[in-house]
Amino acid sequence: MEIQLRNYAHLGDALWEVIVREYTVDKAVNAKSLHKMTTERVNAKFQHDLLITIDELLTPEEKDLVRRARNIPVPIGRRNIQSEYRMATAFETLMGFWYIHNKDRFEEMKDLLNKKIIF
């Protein structure tokens, strides 16, 4: 059974939230700062920027997955910019895809994002 791209994105969205929360849980001094640190990183603009940052590290197959995921028809909220939202969906799709099919790559990118990019 083949998994649809939107299902990878759904999983990737949850994974990204957990990654950020794991990192921020011991960094914040109170609930307000914890929420602020998390929401600054769990949003379409931030994920769009991350995908652009890691683009040069992606394999041709991963870049093809990004291209296909950008074109998934998804509802876009009023406050989101369409191009950013589509790139964020592609980022989430990559995270979900790696988690299901290539745990080593998932861990590699998770470590890179934690150490060098997001914090």
Where are these regions (language model features)?
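Double-stranded RNA-binding/processing signature
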Residues: M1-F119
